[in-house]
C-alpha cells in the first residue's frame, strides 16, 4: 500500500474518531444532566422521607408522653433501603421505590405499578392517621382526667373523695412514668444498636480505605508499566526507523544502485510497524480499560464513603431530632418534678430541723441558767473558803503574837530555836495556801474563758434569731399586703353589689308603680283626642314627615325598652354572680383572718422569745463583763500574791541564812566556851560574848516584830479583799433582784400590750361598723338623689312621663298640659319653644 492511501485511511479514521468523540461528549452531557436530575430527585426524596419519618416519630413519642400504649414504638423502626435493591431497581422507579419503601416495583409492569403505588401510599397514610387518632384519644383521656381532678379539687367534695382522686391521679402518673421509662429504655437500646452499626460502618470504612490504598498502589504500578511499554514502543519505532535507513543507505554506498528487493523490504517493514502499532494499541486499550475500571471502583468506593458519612450525619441527626429532644425534655421535666418534691421534703426537714434547733436552744438556755447557778454556788463556796482562810490567818496571827510574847518572856536559847522552827513550819503552810489560791485563780480564769465561749455561742444564736425574726416580719408584711388587696377587692365588690341592688330596686319600683286602669283609660282618651287633633293638623298642614318621625321614635323607644329589659336580666345575673363571689371572698377573708391571727400569735410568741433572749443576752453580757473584771482582779491579785510569795521566799532565805549564822555562832561560842574552860579566861570576855549574843537576840526580835507587822498588813489586805468580795456578792444579789423586777415589769407591759391590743381590736370593729353605717347612709342619699332625678323638675312630686322632642327634657304630664294651654309654650328647663306635636309620652 502507498503512503498516500495510508494517510487517507488515517484521516478517515481520525474523522470517524472525532465524530464518535463528539457523540460520546453529547451522550456524556445528557448522562450528566440525567444524573443531576436524579440527584435532585433523590435529595427531595430524602428530605420528604426524613420529614415523614420525623412526623411519625413525633406522633409516637407524643402518644407515649400523653399516656398511650407502647405498641406505637414499633413505628420508630424505619426500614432503610439497601444499595443492592436500589441498583436492581430501574432509574425511573427509584423515587417511588424510596418513597413507599417497597421492593416489588422491579418485577411489575406499568399497569400494576400504579396500583402498587396507590396501595403503598394508602398504607403509609393509614398508619399516620391511626397514630393521629391514637394521639387524639390519649389527649382526650388526659383532658378528662384533668377535668375530673379539677372538679374534685374545686368542687364541694369531702376530703376523703379528694384524697381518693389524688391517689388515682398519682397511680396514673406512676403508670405514665413507667411507660416513659420503658420508652426511654427502648430508645436507648435502639441508640446502642445504631451506635453498633456506626462502629461497623467505621470499621468497613477503614477496611475500604485500606483497599483503596492497595488499589491506588496497583494503579500506580500499572501506570509505571504503561509508561515502560510506551518507552519500549518508542525505542522499537526508533530502531525500526534506523534499520530501514541503514538498509537503504548501505546498498547505495556499496553497489551504487537501488536493489530489486526494495519494495518488498519496505512492505515488510510497514507490516511489522503496523503489527507493532496494533499490539501497542491493544495494550494501551487494555490498560485504559483497566484504568477506567479502577476509576469506576474508586468512584464506587467514594460513593460508599459518602453514604457512610451521610449515615453518620443521620446518627447525629437522631441525637438532635425532635423525638430525642422531646424525651430529653420529658426527662428534664420529671427530674424537675423530682427536685420539686425533694425541695418540699427538704423544706419539711428544714422545718423539723428548726424545731429541733429551737428545742436545743431552749435546752441550751436551761443549761446556761444551770451553769450560771453552778458558777454562783462555786463562787459562794470560794467566798466561804476565803473566809475560812481569813479565820485561819487570824488564828495564826494570834498564835504568832502569843509566841512573840512568849519569846520576849523566855530568853532561853532552846525556846528560841523551837520558835524559829515553828515560824518556818507556819511559813511553809502559808506558802502551800498561797499555791492553792494560785490554782484556784487559774481555775477561775479557765471558767472565765468558758463563759466567754458561751457568750460567743449565745451571740451567734441571737443573730440567728434576729434573722428568723426578719424573715417572719417579711412574711407578715406580705400577708398584710395580701389582706389589704383582698379588702380592697371586697370593698369594690360591695360597691358593685350595692349599685346593682339599687338599679334592681329602681327597676322593681318602676315595674311596681303601674298605673290604675282608670288612668290608662284616661290616657287612652287623651291619646285619641290628641290623635284626632293631630290628624286634623296633619290634614291641614300636610305633616306626614313628623308622623313618620314619631313612629320611628316609638320604635326606638320600644327597642330601648327591650334593651333595658335585656340589661336588667344581665344585671340580675351579674348580681347573683357578685353575691356568690362575695360569699367566696368572705370565706377566704375568714380563712385569711384566721391565718393572720395565727401569724400574729406566732409573731407575738417570737417577739416575746426574742425579748427574753435579749434580756438573757444582756444579763449574760453583764455576767461576762463582771467575770472579766473579776478575772482581771484575780490576775492582779495573783501578781500581787506572786510578789508577796517572792518577798516571803527572800525572807525565808534570809531567815535560813540567819539560822545558819546563829548555828555557826553557837558553834563558835561552844568552841570559845571550851577554849575558855581550857584556857581559864576571865569572865569579862564571857560577859562581852553574852552581851553580843543579847544584841543578836534583840536584832532577831526586831526582825520577828517586822515580820509580825507584815503579817498584820497581809491580814488587812485579805480583810479588804473579803470585804470587796462581799460587796460584789451584794452587788450581784442586787442585780438579780433588779432583773427579777425587770421581768415583772416586762410581764406587766405584756399584759398592758395585750389589753391595748384588745382595745384596738374593739376600736377596729367599731370603726368597721361605723364605716358600714356611713356607706349605708351614702347609698340612701344616692337613692334619694336618683329618685329626685326621676321626678319632675317643675313640681318635684310626680314622676317624669312626657318628653319634649326638641330639647329631650322630661317632665310630668300635668305640668306640660299647663304649658300647652298657654299660647307661648316654652320648655321649663331650657326655654325652647315647642308645639303639641313635640310632646311624647315616655315610660320609665
UniProtKB/Swiss-Prot annotation:
Matching PROSITE patterns, A to Z? ZF_RING_1 (PS00518), ZF_RING_2 (PS50089)
Q: What does this protein do?
A: E3 ubiquitin-protein ligase that monoubiquitinates H2B to form H2BK143ub1. It thereby plays a central role in histone code and gene regulation. H2B monoubiquitination, mediated by HUB2, modulates transcriptional regulation of anther development, likely by promoting histone H3K4 dimethylation (H3K4me2) in the chromatin of the key tapetum degradation-related genes C4, CP1 and UDT1.
The organism is Oryza sativa subsp. japonica (Rice)
Write down the chemical reaction(s) this protein catalyses.
Answer: S-ubiquitinyl-[E2 ubiquitin-conjugating enzyme]-L-cysteine + [acceptor protein]-L-lysine = [E2 ubiquitin-conjugating enzyme]-L-cysteine + N(6)-ubiquitinyl-[acceptor protein]-L-lysine
Zn finger region (RING-type): 792-831
Q: What is this protein called?
A: E3 ubiquitin-protein ligase BRE1-like 2
User: What does its UniProt record remark on the domains?
Assistant: The RING-type zinc finger domain mediates binding to an E2 ubiquitin-conjugating enzyme.
Q: Give the EC number(s) under which this enzyme is classified.
A: 2.3.2.27
CDD domains recorded for this chain?
A: RING-HC_Bre1-like (cd16499)
Q: Which GO terms describe its biological process?
A: chromatin organization; flower development; innate immune response; leaf morphogenesis; protein ubiquitination; seed dormancy process; vegetative to reproductive phase transition of meristem
Amino acid at each position: 500500500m502507498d503512503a498516500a492511501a495510508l494517510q487517507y485511511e488515517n484521516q478517515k479514521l481520525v474523522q470517524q474518531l472525532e465524530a464518535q468523540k463528539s457523540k460520546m461528549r453529547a451522550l456524556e452531557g445528557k448522562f450528566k444532566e440525567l444524573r443531576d436530575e436524579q440527584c435532585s430527585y433523590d435529595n427531595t426524596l430524602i428530605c420528604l422521607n426524613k420529614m415523614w419519618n420525623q412526623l411519625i416519630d413525633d406522633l409516637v413519642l407524643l402518644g407515649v408522653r400523653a399516656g398511650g400504649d407502647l405498641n406505637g414504638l414499633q413505628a420508630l423502626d424505619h426500614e432503610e433501603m439497601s444499595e443492592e435493591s436500589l441498583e436492581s431497581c430501574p432509574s425511573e422507579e427509584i423515587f417511588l421505590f424510596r418513597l413507599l419503601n417497597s421492593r416489588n416495583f422491579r418485577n411489575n409492569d406499568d399497569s400494576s405499578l400504579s396500583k402498587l403505588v396507590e396501595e403503598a401510599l394508602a398504607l403509609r397514610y393509614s398508619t399516620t392517621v391511626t397514630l393521629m387518632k391514637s394521639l387524639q384519644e390519649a389527649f382526650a383521656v388526659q383532658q378528662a382526667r384533668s377535668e375530673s381532678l379539677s372538679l374534685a379539687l374545686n368542687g364541694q367534695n369531702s376530703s376523703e373523695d379528694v384524697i381518693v382522686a389524688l391517689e388515682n391521679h398519682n397511680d396514673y402518673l406512676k403508670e405514665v412514668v413507667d411507660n416513659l421509662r420503658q420508652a426511654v429504655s427502648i430508645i436507648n437500646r435502639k441508640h446502642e444498636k445504631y451506635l453498633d452499626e456506626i462502629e461497623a460502618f467505621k470499621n468497613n470504612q477503614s477496611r475500604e480505605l485500606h483497599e483503596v490504598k492497595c488499589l491506588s498502589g496497583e494503579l500506580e504500578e500499572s501506570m509505571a508499566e504503561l509508561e515502560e511499554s510506551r518507552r519500549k514502543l518508542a525505542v522499537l519505532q526508533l530502531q525500526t526507523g534506523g534499520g530501514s535507513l541503514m538498509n537503504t543507505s548501505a546498498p547505495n554506498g556499496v553497489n551504487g544502485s537501488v536493489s530489486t528487493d526494495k519494495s518488498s523490504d519496505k512492505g515488510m517493514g510497514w507490516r511489522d510497524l503496523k503489527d507493532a502499532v496494533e499490539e501497542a494499541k491493544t495494550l494501551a486499550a487494555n490498560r485504559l480499560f483497566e484504568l477506567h475500571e479502577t476509576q469506576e471502583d474508586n468512584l464506587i468506593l467514594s460513593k460508599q464513603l459518602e453514604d457512610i458519612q451521610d449515615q453518620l450525619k443521620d446518627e447525629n441527626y437522631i441525637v438532635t431530632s425532635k423525638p430525642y429532644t422531646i424525651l430529653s425534655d420529658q426527662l428534664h421535666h420529671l427530674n424537675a418534678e423530682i427536685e420539686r418534691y425533694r425541695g418540699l421534703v427538704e423544706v419539711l426537714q428544714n422545718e423539723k430541723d428548726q424545731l429541733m434547733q429551737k428545742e436545743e436552744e431552749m435546752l441550751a438556755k436551761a443549761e446556761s441558767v444551770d451553769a450560771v447557778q453552778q458558777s454562783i454556788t462555786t463562787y459562794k463556796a470560794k467566798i466561804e473558803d476565803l473566809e475560812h482562810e481569813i479565820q485561819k490567818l487570824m488564828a495564826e496571827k494570834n498564835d504568832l503574837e502569843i509566841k512573840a510574847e512568849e519569846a520576849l518572856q523566855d530568853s532561853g536559847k532552846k525556846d528560841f530555836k523551837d520558835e524559829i522552827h515553828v515560824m518556818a513550819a507556819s511559813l511553809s503552810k502559808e506558802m502551800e495556801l498561797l499555791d492553792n489560791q494560785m490554782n484556784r485563780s487559774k481555775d477561775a480564769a479557765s471558767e472565765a474563758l468558758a463563759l466567754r465561749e458561751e457568750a460567743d455561742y449565745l451571740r451567734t444564736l441571737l443573730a440567728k434569731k434576729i434573722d428568723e425574726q426578719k424573715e417572719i416580719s417579711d412574711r407578715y408584711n406580705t400577708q398584710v399586703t395580701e389582706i389589704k388587696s383582698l379588702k380592697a377587692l371586697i370593698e369594690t365588690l360591695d360597691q358593685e353589689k350595692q349599685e346593682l341592688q339599687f338599679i334592681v330596686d329602681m327597676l322593681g319600683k318602676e315595674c311596681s308603680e303601674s298605673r290604675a286602669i282608670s288612668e290608662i283609660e284616661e290616657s287612652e282618651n287623651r291619646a285619641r283626642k290628641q290623635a284626632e287633633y293631630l290628624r286634623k293638623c296633619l290634614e291641614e298642614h300636610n305633616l306626614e314627615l313628623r308622623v313618620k318621625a314619631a313612629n320611628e321614635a316609638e320604635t326606638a323607644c320600644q327597642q330601648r325598652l327591650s334593651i333595658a329589659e335585656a340589661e336588667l336580666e344581665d344585671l340580675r345575673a351579674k348580681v347573683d354572680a357578685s353575691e356568690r363571689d362575695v360569699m367566696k371572698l368572705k370565706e377566704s377573708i375568714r380563712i385569711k383572718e384566721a391565718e393572720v391571727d395565727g401569724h400574729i400569735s406566732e409573731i407575738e410568741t417570737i417577739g416575746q422569745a426574742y425579748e427574753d433572749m435579749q434580756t438573757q443576752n444582756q444579763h449574760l453580757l453583764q455576767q461576762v463583763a463582771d467575770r472579766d473584771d473579776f478575772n482581771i482582779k484575780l490576775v492582779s491579785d495573783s501578781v500581787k500574791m506572786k510578789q508577796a510569795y517572792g518577798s516571803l521566799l527572800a525572807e525565808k532565805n534570809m531567815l535560813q541564812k540567819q539560822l545558819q549564822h546563829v548555828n555557826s555562832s553557837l558553834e563558835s561560842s561552844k568552841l570559845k566556851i571550851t577554849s575558855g574552860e581550857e584556857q581559864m579566861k576571865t569572865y569579862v570576855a564571857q560577859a562581852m560574848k553574852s552581851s553580843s549574843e543579847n544584841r543578836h537576840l534583840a536584832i532577831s526580835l526586831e526582825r520577828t516584830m517586822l515580820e509580825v507587822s507584815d503579817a498584820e498588813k497581809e491580814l488587812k489586805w485579805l480583810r479588804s479583799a473579803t470585804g470587796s468580795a462581799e460587796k460584789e456578792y451584794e452587788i450581784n444579789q442586787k442585780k438579780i433582784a433588779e432583773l427579777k423586777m425587770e421581768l415583772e415589769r416586762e410581764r406587766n407591759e405584756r399584759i398592758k400590750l395585750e389589753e391595748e391590743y384588745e382595745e384596738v381590736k374593739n376600736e377596729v370593729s367599731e370603726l368597721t361598723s361605723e364605716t358600714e353605717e356611713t356607706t349605708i347612709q351614702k347609698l340612701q342619699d344616692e337613692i334619694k338623689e336618683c329618685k329626685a332625678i326621676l321626678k319632675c323638675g317643675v313640681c318635684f312630686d310626680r314622676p317624669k312621663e312626657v318628653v319634649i322632642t326638641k330639647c329631650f327634657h322630661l317632665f310630668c304630664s300635668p305640668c306640660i298640659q299647663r304649658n300647652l294651654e298657654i299660647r307661648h309654650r316654652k320648655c321649663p328647663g331650657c326655654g325652647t319653644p315647642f308645639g303639641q306635636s313635640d310632646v311624647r309620652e315616655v315610660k320609665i
